[in-house]
């Protein structure tokens, strides 16, 4: 969602409809929630020994914050060392959210936006963005909401389209993996050939190679 990117696309493809990949929408609010959790967590870092326990809980169970609330286990009880008792994931989240009202409101908006994205509900997504009261949210989530407001027309295209750059992202990650496994390539053409071999069964060779016939 880089402004420079959109400007360049408009110059090159003036009639194109821009679709923002859904992954980047989720990533934006995901990071905002995580920043909120960390800031809340740090307020307990230098507090009393009793409050410091909440610091460790907020740090330890960060993955639960990013989980869809419907996926939190509310039936299975496990012993959690920091709580010193058997408890469910839902109960852990209820406790952690009770520590800070701003964190709770930010988390709830995050979950609501995730739900609308999953259900492909653009009107619901838009209403959440436009009707959210800023004073109830963390500064990081407020910034993310302003970004989403700015891109609402493009976000609408996202909900109306099935396009995604997931395949391209997967290819890029595969290429990076090839390079990492080989600890880098000194010869570009060897690197290129290895990539092409991984993505195709076609016979390839070094276009700069010299061929001699007897």
Walk through the language-model features, giving the residues of each.
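Acidic/histidine-rich catalytic cores and adjacent linkers
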Residues: 2-13, 17, 23-27, 46-214
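Short, surface-exposed amphipathic charged segments that create phosphate/polyanion-binding patches used
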Residues: 31-42
């Amino acid at each position: 969602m880089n402004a420079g990117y959109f400007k360049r696309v408009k110059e090159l493809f003036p009639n194109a409809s821009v679709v923002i990949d859904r992954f980047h929408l989720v990533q934006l609010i995901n990071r905002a929630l995580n920043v909120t959790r960390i800031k809340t967590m740090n307020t307990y870092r230098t507090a009393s020994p009793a409050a410091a326990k909440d610091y460790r809980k907020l740090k330890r169970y960060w993955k639960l914050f990013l989980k869809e609330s419907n996926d939190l286990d509310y039936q299975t009880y496990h012993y959690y060392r920091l709580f010193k008792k058997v408890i469910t994931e839902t109960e852990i989240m209820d406790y952690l959210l009770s520590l800070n009202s701003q964190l709770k409101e930010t988390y709830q908006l995050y979950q609501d936006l995730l739900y609308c994205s999953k259900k492909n509900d653009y009107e619901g997504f838009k209403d959440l963005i436009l009707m959210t009261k800023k004073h109830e949210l963390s500064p990081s989530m407020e910034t993310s909401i302003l970004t989403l407001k700015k891109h609402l027309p493009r976000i609408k295209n996202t909900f109306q389209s099935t396009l995604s750059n997931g395949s391209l992202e997967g290819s890029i990650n595969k290429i990076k993996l090839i390079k990492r496994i080989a600890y880098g390539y000194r010869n570009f053409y060897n690197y290129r050939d290895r990539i092409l071999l991984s993505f195709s069964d076609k016979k390839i060779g070094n276009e700069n190679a010299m061929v001699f016939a007897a």
